[in-house]
Amino acid sequence: EQLAEVIAVAYRSKWRILPCGNGSKLKWGSLSKHIDVVVSTQRLNKIINHAVGDLTLTVEAGVKFADIQATLAKHNQILALNPTTPDLATIGGIIATGDTGSLRQRYGSVRDQLLGVTFVRADGQIARAGGRVVKNVAGYDLMKLFTGSYGTLSVITEATFRLYPMQSTSGTAMLTGSKEAISQAADTIRGSALTPTQADLLSAQLVSSMGLGKGLGLIVRFESIPESVKEQLNQVLQVGEKLGLTGVQYFDTEEQNLWRLLPEQIHLPEQESEITCKIGVLPNAAVEVLDRAELGLINISSGLGILRFEDEKKVLEMRNLCELRSGFLSILSAPIEVKQKLDVWGYSGNGLELMRGIKKQFDSENILSPGRFVGGI
């Protein structure tokens, strides 16, 4: 209610608001314009309801992702997302940026797991959409609309997610070698009956920097009962062996450290001048893209990934390649002067006018995160 009052005052005063959680993703998106007030949801940090038997969780927007996972672990459950900087990321920020990684291979994206939201409209009114049950049919599906909208449509205060049981055993197979063989291995795994939790293609520089081998990489994780994990890992290694790839298995602490370090290598650049980008291409073009990239990874099924560059010229070259392959490249984090010079979002598709109409409907005075989204929305 206090947050609603603040936004209502801002609406009447025509103050421009930049909503955030812990601020871990404020560098993402376009540069917001003429901000008057920054509103943080850090103190909205309560777990409201954990329905253990129903596998649902309702939390306030400022709860940290790591705190949620620690609470759920006591009941052998998980929220099946893997955002960047999980120790800092809040639920509101994860929804606003649609931030999850390769767990989408098995569990889907943020919007696929979001069941309901409570939010404050631009005029300060509190509203709700969805519910607290998995089979929810009430109202419009605003959850999908708000996911990835970068705080331009509302300020989320509460969210309800579906949960999943924690699996008893986990194991990872890593294949490295030539781009042709890695491409064939990815095609084989995509077309098989294997059920990986995570499966990513890695650039040669990323493979080398982590000491995982030489050439491009394919990393595949399975989580299930021990027998299933062992059998599926063996099948991946057999695929690699037939193609002349080097195969290694990881378990326990070694595996956990591997999956923790992987996103850190990309999202924690050594130089402030480096540029981090989100890309999407057709899965069959992923190896071609990674072969020309410096540091990066791409999910084998969705074709979504993260790349890091040292200069803007290479960003534009990669954007052209992605768009030629029916994809996109948008800049997440970069020096201010780079974002002032380049179009952060790139090709906006054919829905820009529709998006502007939605923005006008939800925020007619343009006070929420102005200019941060695609097309200056």
Q: What do the predicted segments below correspond to?
A:
Residues Y11, A73, R190, E241, ...:
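Anion (oxyanion) recognition and catalysis
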Residues E1-I17, I35, S40-D87, D99-R132, ...:
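N-terminal glycine-rich flavin-associated loop
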Residues K27-K33, S209-L212:
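Short glycine-biased active-site loop of nucleotidyltransferases that positions the nucleotide triphosphate
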Residues E1, S178-A181, F222-V229, L282-A286, ...:
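Helix N-cap motif at beta-to-alpha junctions
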Residues A96, L115-P269:
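C-terminal substrate-binding/cap subdomain adjacent to the FAD-binding core in PCMH-type
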Residues W15-L18, D36-V38, L55-L57, I78-A80, ...:
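Structural motif
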Residues W15, N22, G29-D36, T41-Q42, ...:
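Conserved glycine-rich FAD pyrophosphate-binding loop
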